[in-house]
């Protein structure tokens, strides 16, 4: 008999939506393009780009996601474009306007999405005492593409400061998002500092950082600095699609067919799902909103994609929308799990425990199964396969459950 932790919880391929560049009310990209044009001499279109993304739009987006089961990650940039800290108040808006947005985010966005900072400003590197740009000016996404590895404490404190601002407004982050190229040339070091930076604020044993994209081939979720004794690790989240919802400019390409075609067979997502690879969509908030409140080009494209994916798997037998932290926590649990088979008994040592832990068992026919003395219910269809059940398909049996203890025993009857 062979036993392994299944690659995906409930053996359903995860789908997740990454939203980058979002924050409290302001469109930070207006200021990024304005300021970056001065720095590099390029002529990005910026003057007619909206300065504000209304709370009403964000609320409508969140309600749609909750209604249709969409899950993922939503950035809240802590000090957007160095305009001010959101825990101290942005000078552009009243305290009441900002508190209203934050309350909406805590009630609606958090229900469907992880919250992460996208480092502190997504533009200038700031001094941690003043939160003003350092001189000479450095850019988070350009000058810190290679993080200053010789200043480990500074980088750790910088990431921790981003997390602390969010925690101060009741939005404890599950991990961090990289602004542009941030950390891309020093990924191992980046992973090293993310762990203590996030844990020092939230206590999360398995935070993640979003860095990188898989254009083709396998979609990995690397696990860094795993410590089985402490039950800690850092996961690296990677996207697996391009951004065809308006992109980072807010006026880029919009094409739902590039995700999934109307006949449900073409596009990037079906290719991923059919190969058992996570479909992790990367989009930008300014693209969802577009150029004005009646535009919503990216949001309209998302609605089409969500509808087509539901048509493709109407009973949710093969796929499941997930928060990014659900994907990364499961990857940590799977990577660190120890599985020992002794006859009809499976001994599990689980430094990281996650909901819906799923085992794949081959080489024997299972009549009954129990976890910690509690029987699992036998089901005969994928639609009914859930935590607390087991399902036999062909030569394999899947068993899913909620492990209550690090050392868990699964008893089988053949």
What are these regions (language model features)?
Residues 1-9, 16, 22, 28, ...:
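Active-site-adjacent pocket scaffolds in enzyme catalytic domains
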Residues 21-24, 77-83, 120-124, 180-185, ...:
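Short, solvent-exposed loop/turn segments at secondary-structure junctions
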Residues 324, 334-414:
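C-terminal beta-sandwich/jelly-roll accessory domains of carbohydrate-active enzymes
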Residues 272, 283-287, 292-336:
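Catalytic cores of secreted or luminal carbohydrate-active enzymes
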Residues 44-61, 91-103, 152-161, 188-196, ...:
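Well-ordered, non-membrane alpha-helical segments in soluble/globular domains
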Residues 14-16, 26-27, 34-142, 174-177, ...:
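Short, well-structured secondary-structure segments
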Residues 1-14, 352, 405, 413-414:
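Mature N-terminal, pre-catalytic/accessory segment of carbohydrate-active enzymes
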Residues 44-49, 88, 145-151, 248-257, ...:
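Surface-exposed cleft-lining segments at the edges of enzyme active sites
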């Amino acid at each position: 008999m062979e036993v392994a932790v299944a690659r995906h919880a409930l053996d359903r391929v995860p789908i997740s939506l990454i939203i980058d560049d979002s924050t409290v009310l302001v469109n930070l990209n207006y200021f990024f393009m304005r300021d970056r044009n001065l720095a590099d001499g390029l002529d990005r279109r910026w003057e007619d780009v909206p300065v504000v993304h209304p709370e009403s739009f964000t609320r409508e987006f969140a309600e749609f996601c909750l209604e249709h089961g969409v899950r993922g990650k939503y950035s809240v940039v802590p000090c957007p474009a160095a305009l001010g800290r959101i825990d101290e108040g942005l000078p552009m808006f009243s305290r009441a306007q900002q508190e209203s947005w934050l309350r909406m985010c805590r009630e609606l966005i958090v229900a469907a999405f992880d919250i992460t900072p996208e480092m502190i400003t997504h533009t200038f590197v700031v001094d941690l005492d003043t939160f003003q740009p350092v001189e000479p000016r450095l850019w988070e996404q350009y000058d810190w593409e290679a993080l200053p590895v010789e200043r480990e404490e500074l980088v750790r404190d910088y990431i921790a400061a981003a997390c602390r601002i969010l925690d101060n407004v009741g939005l404890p982050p599950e991990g961090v998002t990289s602004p542009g190229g941030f950390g891309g040339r020093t990924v191992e070091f980046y992973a090293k500092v993310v762990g203590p930076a996030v844990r020092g604020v939230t206590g999360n044993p398995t935070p993640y950082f979003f860095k990188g994209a898989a254009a083709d081939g396998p979609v990995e979720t690397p696990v860094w600095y795993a410590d089985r004794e402490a039950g800690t690790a850092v996961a690296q989240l990677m996207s697996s699609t391009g951004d065809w919802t308006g992109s980072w400019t807010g006026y880029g390409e919009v094409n739902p067919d590039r995700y999934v075609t109307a006949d449900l067979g073409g596009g990037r997502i079906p290719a991923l799902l059919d190969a058992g690879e996570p479909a992790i969509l990367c989009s930008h908030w300014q693209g969802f909103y577009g150029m004005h409140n009646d535009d919503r080009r990216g949001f309209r494209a998302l609605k089409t994609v969500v509808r087509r994916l539901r048509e493709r798997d109407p009973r949710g037998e093969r796929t499941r929308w997930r928060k990014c932290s659900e994907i990364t926590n499961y990857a940590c649990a799977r990577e660190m799990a120890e599985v020992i088979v002794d006859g009809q008994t499976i001994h599990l040592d689980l430094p990281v425990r996650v909901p819906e832990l799923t085992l794949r068992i081959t080489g024997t026919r299972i009549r009954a199964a129990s976890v910690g003395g509690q029987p699992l219910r036998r089901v005969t269809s994928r639609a009914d396969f859930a935590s607390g059940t087991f399902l036999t398909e062909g030569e394999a049996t899947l068993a899913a459950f909620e492990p209550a203890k690090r050392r868990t025993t699964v008893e089988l009857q053949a």
